């Protein structure tokens, strides 16, 4: 089901601070995805927060428009993020930051979110010992 419920939103201040300080990041302009493994209060694979800087977009209307596009792209593609996490029986906190200077279209937003999902899946998958042996032999 493609929903984005309240339980899936990251709102706990300590978790947000810890994700920013200890998390790993993936960059795909105009987005930065910061994630860290966390023990969440609810039984979901991940909680997500989306943010657009006030310094780049002075008008709240513009910030809200970008966040709305980000939420919709996340909602439609969240299974690409959550399935790898669920396979490993982990829980993660994820922060999605918008760092661009202009408002992008939904199509651009969705394509960048999909690219982030692919890179995220590659980064969190456990290292395969067979793959490591092949690397060391070469």
Model feature map: region roles:
Residues 1-138:
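Positively charged, solvent-exposed patches that mediate nucleic-acid binding
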């Amino acid at each position: 089901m493609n929903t984005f419920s309240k339980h899936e939103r990251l709102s706990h201040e300590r978790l947000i601070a810890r994700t920013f300080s200890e998390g790993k990041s993936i960059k795909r302009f105009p987005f930065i995805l910061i994630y860290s493994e966390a023990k969440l209060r609810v039984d979901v694979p991940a909680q997500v927060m989306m943010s657009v800087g006030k310094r780049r977009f002075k008008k709240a209307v513009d910030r809200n428009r970008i966040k709305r596009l980000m939420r919709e792209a996340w909602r439609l593609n969240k299974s690409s993020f959550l399935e790898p996490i669920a396979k490993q029986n982990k829980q993660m906190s994820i922060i999605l930051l918008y760092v661009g200077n202009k408002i992008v279209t939904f199509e651009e937003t969705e394509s960048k979110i999909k690219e982030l999902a692919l890179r995220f899946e590659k980064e969190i998958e456990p290292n395969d010992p067979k793959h490591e042996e092949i690397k060391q032999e070469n």
